[in-house]
């Protein structure tokens, strides 16, 4: 302003100053057009000194990258027309830029996070339901017997029924194998469980009929248990016999050195002929003697 001080005084100086300020862009606190509830913030970036006259002033975005690359300006300021008299000196130039930030109406709303937590939106999976057999089923005279049998013979798939009866299974060829005997034992055990269920149903009838049915079913159960025991014993006996045969074969193979020779009937006849003619070694055997042997 020292340049204009001696030339413009009073009203002329004020007019010149107002005209100069009209061409300059200053930030205002009023909201911009089309953007409600906004406030302006001013940041300054220092430009490096111009070394030569041919150097062009870079854009505000490039100037921001030279000084502070982490905070580039969003909108470049308008470039006002400059007269020859108003050109600044070749020194550091301050460039003012405006950053427009949207200010919410409610200040409490800014404290809340933008997106809700994923943990709140996730649906909690319900735990799996386990079905427990009610204790009311074990009521009656045969409750303890039923409970003990279920605990003793409980297994995976014990309730699977077979298409064949006990007699049809026994009539099958090769039914003496161990696997088939075990299958029959499993079927009999499942049959026992069915009998126990029948006992539980029979306890709801009259006293005399209930006692008779219970005695009959318990007797059938005892018979089936005896049959199972006999099958198990026969299986065990066969296993023991097979082990004995295997041990005998192993011991014979260990002691046999090939010196013992067992002659068949034909070998004995030939041995007699050879032994009878041993004294007459010079004479050859007759063909008729050899042909008379029935091979």
From Swiss-Prot:
One of its GO terms (molecular function) is RNA-directed RNA polymerase activity. The gene is P. Keywords: Host cytoplasm, Phosphoprotein, Viral RNA replication, Virion. Residues 83-99, 105-122 have a biased composition (Basic and acidic residues). Constitutively phosphorylated by host. GO terms for cellular component: host cell cytoplasm; virion component. This is Phosphoprotein. Residues 263-281 are annotated as: Binding to RNA-directed RNA polymerase L. Residues 166-207 are annotated as: Oligomerization and binding to RNA-directed RNA polymerase L. The keyword Phosphoprotein applies. Residues 51-122 are annotated as: Disordered.
């Amino acid at each position: 302003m020292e340049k204009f001080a001696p030339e413009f005084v009073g009203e002329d100086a004020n007019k010149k100053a107002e005209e100069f300020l009209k061409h300059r862009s200053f930030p205002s606190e009023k909201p911009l057009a089309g953007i409600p509830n906004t406030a302006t913030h001013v940041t300054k970036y220092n430009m490096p000194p111009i070394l030569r006259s041919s150097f062009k002033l870079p854009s505000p975005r490039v100037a921001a990258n030279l000084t502070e690359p982490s905070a580039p300006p969003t909108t470049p300021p308008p470039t006002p027309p400059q007269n020859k008299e108003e050109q600044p000196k070749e020194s550091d130039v301050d460039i003012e830029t405006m950053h427009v930030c949207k200010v919410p109406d409610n200040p409490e709303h800014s404290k809340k996070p933008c997106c809700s937590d994923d943990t709140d939106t996730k649906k909690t999976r319900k735990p799996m339901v386990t079905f427990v057999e009610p204790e009311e089923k074990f009521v009656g005279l045969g409750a303890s017997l039923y409970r003990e049998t279920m605990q003793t013979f409980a297994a995976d798939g014990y309730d699977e029924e077979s298409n064949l009866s006990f007699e049809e299974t026994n009539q099958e060829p090769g039914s003496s194998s161990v696997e088939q005997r075990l299958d029959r034992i499993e079927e009999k055990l499942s049959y026992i469980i069915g009998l126990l269920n029948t006992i539980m149903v029979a306890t709801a009838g009259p006293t005399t009929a209930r006692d008779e049915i219970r005695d009959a079913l318990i007797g059938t159960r005892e018979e089936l248990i005896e049959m199972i025991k006999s099958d198990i014993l026969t299986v065990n006996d066969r296993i023991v016999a097979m082990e004995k045969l295997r041990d005998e074969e192993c011991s014979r193979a260990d002691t046999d050195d090939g010196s013992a020779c067992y002659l068949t009937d034909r070998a004995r006849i030939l041995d007699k002929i050879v032994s009878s003619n041993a004294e007459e070694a010079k004479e050859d055997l007759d063909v008729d003697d050899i042909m008379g042997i029935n091979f």
